[in-house]
Amino acid sequence: HDEQTYQFEIAQFYCELAQTALFKSNLDAARYNVQKALDANKKCARANMILGDIETKQGNFPAAVEAYGAIEQQNHAYLSMVGEKLYEAYSAQGKQEEGLNRLIGYMQTFPDLDLINVIYEKALLLKGESEAAQLAIDLVRQKPDLNGVYRLLGLKISDMNPAWKADADMMRSVIGRQLQRSVMYRCRNCHFKSQV
């Protein structure tokens, strides 16, 4: 267990160096440190998040897709953090439909992911309002949560009986306030919590 902890900490150290190098647009140093992080801990999702950002910055979109996609095998929970970037890497190659389908596939495989907003926004661009709305509704119904219900109410309010509209609007604003309060990041390793 201690060996694992050290590997995790070493990988995080290299990720910090890579993130700093990326911020300074020193992409060679960033890439080197990402590789060191992955050498220390091959399950380091953060390293692939940074690698995807490096590849995107260099215009190497197929490699960005590969880096972001590798997160599924490392820790699928982090896919929520790269959903939009993954789609944009597909889009830069003219493969918007493929990118959208991959995000939908992730939601169907891992219903706990928070990708509903990205999927809805991208489907809206590609398929139009009614198809995007139906897609969002179907995905929310698979595993309802506050974020999904908030989105669902937003989609349904315009079709509602006027007598219900005010109540539905009030429910949506209560859910929205609760969502703002509950957006927390929790580290699975050290249990650190932070408002995102």
Feature roles, as predicted:
Residues 5-12, 46, 80-81, 114-115, ...:
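Start-of-helix register in tetratricopeptide repeats
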Residues 19, 53, 88, 121-122, ...:
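Residue-level recognition of tetratricopeptide repeat
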Residues 36-39, 70-73, 107-108, 140-141:
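Conserved structural position within tetratricopeptide repeats
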Residues 24, 58, 93, 126-127, ...:
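Structural motif corresponding to the intra-repeat A-B loop/turn of tetratricopeptide repeats
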